[in-house]
Amino acid sequence: GGSLLFIPDLPCPMNEAKKAAGEQAVELVRTGMRVGLGTGSTTAYALRAIGRRIRESSLHVMGVPTSFASERLARECGIPLTTLDEIDELDLALDGADEVSPDLDLIKGRGGAHTREKVVAAQARRFVVLTDPSKDVERLGAKRVLPVEVLPMATGPVLRTLTGLGANASLRMGREKDG
């Protein structure tokens, strides 16, 4: 099952809310767990907190990163890594979101790691989304565009299909962000 870890409006800067969400999420991590390590600024706080617990206590976990950026950060934090080829499932996956609706529907993937994030989330017994008040929207897609990750060989058909559905689709190459 999934859950949403939301830190309500706090009388502090947004980075403090993100840090609070990340550190609260790490309380779910137990020794022996295999943990999906998500992507984004809020999840980065969780990865740093996991690394701190590994260094300062007897926490032993294995992480599966959802992006090149989270893999790099996990290594810097001293989190041992594995892959989904090497293990069957994850006990927990922690990840962020780009937008959250009042019904707790999400948009993810603007960082360019959508497919990896989805695969890791699907392999987790529990999927926890870390968010802060800046991600709240009344309607998904109201603030920014909806990301759709497409294989290079499918770019033409997908663009034609989206345009046929009335979307104003454009291509952004995966050379930026976290992917």
Where are the language model's segments positioned?
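Residue-identity detector for glycine
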Residues: 1-2
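N-terminal glycine-/serine-/threonine-rich phosphate-binding loop
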Residues: 6-92
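Conserved phosphate- and dinucleotide-binding cores of soluble alpha/beta proteins
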Residues: 15-19, 68-179
